[in-house]
């Protein structure tokens, strides 16, 4: 934050965005406990910059086609010893904020996973997430220098150079979708980005294998991760998690971009 010496920064909270003026203020309000807020703005044309400035954030502007590259730029922009990585649709609760402060003062490890409570609209949907369609936890708290994102457009792979610590007990609130239409749009966006990665690497795979994954992922999310407990939303989560690989595969085979 302005006026604070760089050496005093223990914790940086960082988010990377593209035109998130509708959600950014609420996100930043929930990370105001950090010593530094960093906002990486990817080709933003809305009012996001003014919002970030209001919170005294360190702002990095640029253009990134690869999600992993953008996230790595965000990490590099942080001055803190520890980094808390959040998305614009995520809110850090007061209990989680207090736990994070305690962990960074006492942890002998290099990174920790954070549990996630996902919301569709105003409804909390806790069960069924995973298999590249949603997250139940993520490695969001880490020392600078131990986490590197891979060069993928969607769901970049991670490379670690440090020791994993215990999972945090409190959860971040993730307002992932407003409703079913958002869920469908997200599946379309994810599969398009994944198809581009597959074409570039030549790793398109076989139709038969991706059909098999449709069923295995559905069973994993609906039965193994108890999506059945969430009613219709749980059914859709499992269905979309299963469809994601086969739709990505077909797009990679049939479409140029």
Q: Predicted regions span which residues?
A:
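Short, Lys/Arg-enriched N-terminal segments with co-localized hydrophobic residues
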Residues: 1-6
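Cell-envelope/extracellular polymer assembly enzymes that use nucleotide-activated donors
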Residues: 10-12, 36
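Short, well-formed alpha-helical segments that are part of the catalytic scaffolds
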Residues: 14-33
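Acidic helix N-cap motif at the loop->helix transition within catalytic regions
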Residues: 22-25, 46-55, 95-96
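A conserved acidic beta->alpha catalytic loop
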Residues: 30, 41-51, 64, 87
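Short, structured coil segments at secondary-structure junctions
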Residues: 33, 54-56, 161
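Conserved donor nucleotide-binding strand/loop of the catalytic core
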Residues: 49-77
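Catalytic-site signature of metal-activated, phosphate-bearing donor transferases
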Residues: 69-75, 82, 86, 93-257
């Amino acid at each position: 934050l302005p006026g604070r010496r760089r050496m005093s920064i223990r914790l940086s909270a960082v988010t990377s965005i593209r035109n998130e003026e509708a959600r950014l203020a609420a996100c930043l309000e929930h990370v105001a406990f950090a010593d530094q807020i960093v906002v990486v703005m990817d080709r933003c044309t809305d009012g996001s910059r003014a919002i970030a400035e209001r919170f005294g954030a360190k702002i990095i502007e640029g253009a990134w086609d690869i999600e992993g590259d953008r996230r790595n730029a965000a990490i590099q922009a942080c001055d803190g010893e520890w980094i808390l990585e959040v998305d614009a649709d995520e809110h850090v609760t007061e209990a989680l904020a207090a736990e994070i402060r305690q962990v960074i003062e006492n942890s002998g490890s290099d990174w920790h996973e954070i549990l996630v409570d996902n919301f569709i609209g105003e409804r909390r949907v806790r069960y069924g997430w995973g298999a590249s369609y949603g997250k139940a936890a993520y490695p969001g708290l880490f020392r600078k220098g131990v986490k590197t994102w891979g060069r993928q457009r969607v769901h970049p792979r991670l490379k670690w150079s440090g020791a994993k610590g215990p999972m945090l007990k409190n959860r971040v609130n993730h307002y992932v979708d407003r409703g079913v239409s958002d869920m469908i749009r997200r599946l379309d966006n994810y599969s398009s980005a994944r198809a581009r990665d597959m074409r570039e690497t030549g790793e398109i795979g076989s139709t038969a294998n991706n059909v098999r994954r449709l069923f295995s992922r559905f069973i994993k999310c609906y039965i193994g991760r108890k999506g059945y407990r969430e009613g219709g939303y749980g059914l859709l989560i499992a269905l979309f998690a299963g469809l994601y690989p086969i739709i990505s595969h077909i797009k990679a085979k049939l479409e140029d971009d």
